[in-house]
């Protein structure tokens, strides 16, 4: 079907159903283009909780739509592609958290938002890549178990050395592709460019970066920087906003494999179908909902 026809159908259905469309920065360009709000996990979770619309089409992956449902239980949250998952989120289970609590009873669980609702429900507070350092630093307990991402955890550990932090062994398979050699090669090809990377990258990659931050923080940094060239170390979906907001600047992706296949599953067709058929509705068990909402609300409260 013609792209413009699809877009018009989406706009019409959105109005009819009083729906809100949000998209993560890693979505395909066309999906970001039709979204009401585009951003990182923290920004979108706040938007979904604060907006009045009763129907939310979440163009992202499962854990993100799940978080939106937890924060807005009375809203209808739709995920255009139900099999858009996250391998990192699947690297930890609720049982793992229970075992950690038994083994380390004095430690608090700080859980990255890239996790299932059942894991969030057993955690003390949730964080995103944009506020992980702040959450860990300000959390009242000095003994922390950080899960599931060991690379983000390692970044936090370095920023907050005064705390005793135990790391879980999960990682993002897309960001994990970037190696130290890739950064060195990119720097030699573009000596005037600043290196901006996501904290899900390996510690040795983060070490070589000029700036480390969430997708929104990377975009904000490039927007306000006086520099004209940037090497980007995160999923290539961010290039859409970077180029749109900075037509006079140059952006080079750090590794050609910076594509998250799950994030790319949502299409204009599936967004249209989500609105038309009101699918796929995200539901969270009441028992899980309660604990997960408490941990997510704690994050929003802490900022």
Curated annotation (Swiss-Prot):
Its main location: cytoplasm. It is an enzyme of class 2 (transferase). Pathway: Cofactor biosynthesis; NAD(+) biosynthesis; quinolinate from iminoaspartate: step 1/1. Binds 1 [4Fe-4S] cluster per subunit. Pfam families: NadA. Its cofactor is [4Fe-4S] cluster. This is Quinolinate synthase.
């Amino acid at each position: 079907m013609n792209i413009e026809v699809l877009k018009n159908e989406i706009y019409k259905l959105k109005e009819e159903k009083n729906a809100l469309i949000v998209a993560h920065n890693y979505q395909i360009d066309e999906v970001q283009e039709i979204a009401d709000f585009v951003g990182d996990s923290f920004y979108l979770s706040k938007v979904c909780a604060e907006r009045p619309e009763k129907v939310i089409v979440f163009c992202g992956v499962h854990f993100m739509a799940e978080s939106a449902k937890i924060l807005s239980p009375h809203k209808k949250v739709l995920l255009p592609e139900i099999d858009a998952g996250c391998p990192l989120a699947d690297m930890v289970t609720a049982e793992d958290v229970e075992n950690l609590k038994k083994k380390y009873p004095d430690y608090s669980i700080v859980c990255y938002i890239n996790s299932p609702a059942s894991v969030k429900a057993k955690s003390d507070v949730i964080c995103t890549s944009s506020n992980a350092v702040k959450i860990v630093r300000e959390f009242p307990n000095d003994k922390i178990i950080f899960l599931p991402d060991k690379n983000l955890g390692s970044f936090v550990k370095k920023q907050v050395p005064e705390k005793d932090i135990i790391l879980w062994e999960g990682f993002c398979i897309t960001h994990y592709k970037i190696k130290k050699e890739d950064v060195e090669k990119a720097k030699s090809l573009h000596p005037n460019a600043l290196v901006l990377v996501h904290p899900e990258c390996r510690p040795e990659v983060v070490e070589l970066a000029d700036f480390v931050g969430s997708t929104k923080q990377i975009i904000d940094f490039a927007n306000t920087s006086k520099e004209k060239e940037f090497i980007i170390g995160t999923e290539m979906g961010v290039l859409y906003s970077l180029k749109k907001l900075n037509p006079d600047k140059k952006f080079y992706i750090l590794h050609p494999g910076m594509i998250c296949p799950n994030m790319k599953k949502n299409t204009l067709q599936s967004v249209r179908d989500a609105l038309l058929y009101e699918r796929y509705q995200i539901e969270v068990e009441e028992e899980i909902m309660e604990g997960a909402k408490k941990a997510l609300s704690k994050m929003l409260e802490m900022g």
